[in-house]
Amino acid sequence: MFIYAIGTETRQKIGISKNPHKRLKQLQTGNAEQLVLHHMIEVHDDRTRLLERFLHKDIGYKKLKGEWFNLTKQEAKDYLTFAEITWVNDPLLSLKL
């Protein structure tokens, strides 16, 4: 499973998918703005939803609606890279929710 950042220059959807490229096509359907897969990290299946919930909570102050956040593509890439280094294998992640 992957956690991805798909969006525009200034708005990002942070979500999970087995196939982020397919998910991009699904999200693009009916969306007037051109969406791009900006970044993705691979996460063990048993930790994917936990990490996604944690990320959504951690950047909740930038939330727009649903899983969409007020993040530039570079902020999203930097954030997911940081998450991969810091939290993907953190055994105490569930305690941080």
What are these model-predicted stretches?
Residues M1-L97:
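Non-catalytic accessory segments flanking enzymatic or RNA/DNA-binding domains
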